[in-house]
């Protein structure tokens, strides 16, 4: 009412009530029984980070993308014997056919010591036929390259005696009629192949 004086509202009791409620709330939420205290804190999410702009360069392969390989990454030694060399298959495919069977030659060597570093190396091949006794021959190489001319007749050889071979000498073998292995040695003389020895083994 106008003109009637009334005392102001007491604020102290309200502040006291509010303070008591806050204190009761805080006491009820002590660290010992709080669900907040028992809940692990959230870790920062990757989704809040800003994505990187797309790159035009391909990303490097992951280290865990492929299982480790048991194969070594070292390059193949060109001076090692390599009977699976593509050079052998190419040369054999270009040879004239076997004169007896008129068949091409099988590119898989029966024996040999072919390598790109030897002054003289050879492979023994057979005619690509199902005959019981196919024709065999040796094919010779100088520093990994086929020697097409100037080579003595190499038909009939069936193997190679690597224990008698050197960097410039090849020891080819063939079986004689009486069951003995014979060895014929050929050597690179600087300009061609020459026959240097003939021995009969047991």
Curated annotation (Swiss-Prot):
Biased composition (Polar residues): 32-46
Keyword Membrane among record annotations: yes
Pfam families referenced in this protein's UniProt entry, alphabetically: Lipoprotein_21
Signal sequence region: 1-28
Main location group: membrane
Bias (Pro residues): 51-61
Biased composition (Low complexity): 62-75
One Gene Ontology term, aspect cellular component: extracellular region
Chain positions covered by the region annotation Disordered: 29-78
Membrane topology: Lipid-anchor
Keywords linked to the UniProt accession: Cell membrane, Lipoprotein, Membrane, Palmitate, Signal
Domain of life the protein comes from: Bacteria
Locations listed in the record: Cell membrane
Protein name: Putative lipoprotein LprE
Covalently attached lipid (S-diacylglycerol cysteine), positions: 29
InterPro entries: LppP/LprE (IPR025971)
Covalently lipidated residues, kind N-palmitoyl cysteine: 29
Annotated source species: Mycobacterium tuberculosis (strain ATCC 25618 / H37Rv)
């Amino acid at each position: 009412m106008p003109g009637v004086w009334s005392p102001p509202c007491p604020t102290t009791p309200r502040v006291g009530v509010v303070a008591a409620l806050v204190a009761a709330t805080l006491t009820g939420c002590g660290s010992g029984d709080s669900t907040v205290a028992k809940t692990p804190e959230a870790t920062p999410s990757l989704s809040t980070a800003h994505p990187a702009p797309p790159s035009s360069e391909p990303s490097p392969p992951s280290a865990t993308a492929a299982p480790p390989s048991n194969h070594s990454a070292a390059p193949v030694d060109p001076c090692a014997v390599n009977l699976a060399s593509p050079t052998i298959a190419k040369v054999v495919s270009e040879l004239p056919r076997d004169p007896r069977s008129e068949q091409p030659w099988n590119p898989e060597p029966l024996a040999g010591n072919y390598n790109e570093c030897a002054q003289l190396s050879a492979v023994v091949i057979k005619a690509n036929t199902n005959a019981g006794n196919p024709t065999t021959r040796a094919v010779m190489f100088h520093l990994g390259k086929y020697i097409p001319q100037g080579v003595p007749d190499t038909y009939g050889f069936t193997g190679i005696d690597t224990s008698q071979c050197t960097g410039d000498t090849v020891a080819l073998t063939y079986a004689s009629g009486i069951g003995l292995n014979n060895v014929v040695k050929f050597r690179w003389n600087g300009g061609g192949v020459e026959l240097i020895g003939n021995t009969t083994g047991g």
